[in-house]
Amino acid sequence: MTNANEKLITIFGADGFVGTQVVQDLAQAGYRIRVAVRRPDLAGHVKTSGDVGQILPIQANIRNMASVERAVNNADIVINLVGIKTKSGKQTFEAVHIDGAKNIAIAAKNANVENFVHLSALGADKNSDSIYSRTKALGEEAVLKAFPKAIILRPSIIFGNGDKFFNMFGAMAAISPILPMIGKDTLFQPIYVGDVAKAISLAATGKVKASKIYELGGADIESMQDLLKRVVKETGRKNILLPVPFWFAKTKAFFLQILPSPLLTIDQVKQLEDDNIVSEKAIKEKATLASFGIKATSMDIILPTYMWRFRNHGQFEKQEI
C-alpha cells in the first residue's frame, strides 16, 4: 500500500457510482477496506483500486441484522452509501432508507467504531409529499438516535462519468428531437462525484465535526431548464425543450412506474416540485462543502469529459466555443 494504514473501513454500497470513487480515495490513503454488498461476485471491479488483499468484497444485506453485524465486525470506521430511487420487491424506501440505515447505525455503535458516515440527500424532509425525501429524513433520525456522533451528508444531484441525470438526458437527446422539461424553474445545485467522495473520506477519517448534518452543493445553481440547455450544448444537438406541467407528468408517471425499471415515477415528479439547493441555515451554520476545505468543481470542467459520447461524431464532433 502507498500510505499503509492499519485501520479497517466497512463501506455499505461501495460498488455504486459514489462508492467506487470513495473506495479509490480511501485505498490511495492506505486504508484497508471491506466492501459490503449484496452481490460480492459483481463487485470485483472495486478491488482494482487498491493493492492485493487491501479491498475485500463481502456479502451483506442491510435488511438482515446478522449480515450487517458480520460486515462491521472489527471495523474502525463504517460508511453507509446505500440508497434507492425506485422501490423493487422487498427493496422499499422504508426498508432501505430507514430500517437498513438503522441496522447499520446500531451495529456500528455496538461494534464501537470510531466514526460513522451516512449518505442522505438534499431535500430530506419528514414532512415531504415525496416518499423518497420523507424516508431519507426518517433514516437520518434513526441513524442519529442509534449513533449520536454520526456524520450525515446531504448532496444535491451528483454528476460525473456514470451519473444517472446527465447520462439519461444525453441518451434521450441522441434519439429524440424533444427533451421533456418537468419543473423547468426548479433550482438544483449539482455536485461533482469526486467532491462528494472527498467529503465522505474526510468525514470518515475524522477531519470534520461529528454529530452534524452537512449539505453539499456544487459551484453552480441552475434551473432544470438551464441544466437541459447544458445537455443540448454538450451533445451538439438541436433538441426542443418542451415544458411539461406537473399534473401531466404525474399522469404519465402513473403508467410508467408499473414497469420493472421505470423511467419516471410519481414520487420523482413530486421531488421535482421543490428546489434542491443548499439552505441558508446550512450556510449560516457552516455545514456545507466549504467546511471540508473543498472547492466545488464546476460542471463546465467535468461535463465535456463524458457527454461527448452522445454527439453525432463523438470526440471528433466540432464544438462551438
Annotate each language-model stretch with its function.
Residues 2-31:
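N-terminal Rossmann NAD(P)H-binding glycine-rich loop of SDR-like oxidoreductase domains
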Residues 5-8, 32, 84-146, 150-155:
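Conserved Rossmann-fold NAD(P)-dependent oxidoreductase catalytic core, especially the SDR/UDP-sugar
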Residues 31-41:
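Conserved glycine-rich Rossmann-like NAD(P)H-binding loop of the short-chain dehydrogenase/reductase
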Residues 40-103, 107-110, 122-126:
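NAD(P)H-binding glycine-rich loop region in Rossmannoid oxidoreductase-like domains
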Residues 103, 164-165, 183-205, 212-215:
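Substrate-positioning beta->alpha
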Residues 128-130, 151-170, 222:
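Flexible, glycine-rich beta-alpha linker
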Residues 187-194, 216-233, 243-254, 295-298:
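Substrate-binding strand-loop-helix patch
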Residues 247-321:
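A hydrophobic C-terminal alpha-helical subdomain
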